[in-house]
């Protein structure tokens, strides 16, 4: 029996904003498989690799993990400030080198990730959705700038952070 069921509580609702390299791939699959979490959306952001590559990785991971009924959207293709630094030596040319991934398991929504985040936050009860950025924080910053009236509706932000300075040191 899950912790949520034992405590008679609802799963925590999350939006996963990611740049799937190896770490984010694990985070996505764990979020989907965890009965204490309700994955409301997956958004991608340029980070470990280009937006095109990390989005393709996220779509392939949806197939691998059997993720269904969750909207996916691509977001920011570059950082807000400075050039994008791609650590090919860490995550490889694809951003997820190693496994041979299948073709996309889900179609992308016809909207920008920032707008999908806003739609989900607006649709759900205030204070019930946690943002979980595991990559660059560009989409989260753009969400706060574009939709300041929705920021107070966010339950919180749980992030996997890096460092200021050279990427992936």
List PLM regions with ranges:
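Active-site histidine-anchored catalytic micro-motif
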Residues: 7-18, 22-60, 67, 94, ...
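Acidic, polar-rich low-complexity tracts and alpha-helical solenoid repeat scaffolds
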Residues: 4-5, 72
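A short alpha-helix-loop-beta-strand transition element characteristic
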Residues: 66-73
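Surface-exposed loop and adjacent secondary-structure segments within mature catalytic domains
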Residues: 73-101
């Amino acid at each position: 029996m899950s912790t949520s069921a034992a405590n008679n509580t609802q799963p925590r609702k999350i939006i996963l904003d990611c740049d799937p390299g190896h770490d984010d791939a694990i985070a996505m699959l764990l979020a989907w498989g965890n009965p204490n979490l309700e994955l409301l959306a997956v958004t991608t952001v340029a980070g470990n690799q280009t937006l095109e590559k990390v989005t393709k990785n996220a779509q392939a991971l949806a197939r691998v993990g059997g993720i269904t009924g969750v909207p996916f959207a691509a977001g920011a293709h570059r950082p807000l400030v400075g050039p994008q630094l791609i650590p090919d030596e860490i995550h490889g040319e694809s951003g997820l080198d190693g496994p041979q991934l299948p073709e996309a398991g889900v179609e992308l929504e016809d909207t920008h990730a920032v707008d999908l985040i806003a739609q989900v936050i607006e649709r759900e009860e205030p204070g019930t959705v946690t943002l979980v950025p595991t990559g660059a924080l560009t989409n989260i910053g753009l969400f706060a700038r574009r939709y300041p009236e929705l920021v107070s509706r966010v339950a919180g932000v749980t992030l996997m952070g890096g460092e200021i300075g050279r990427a992936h040191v």
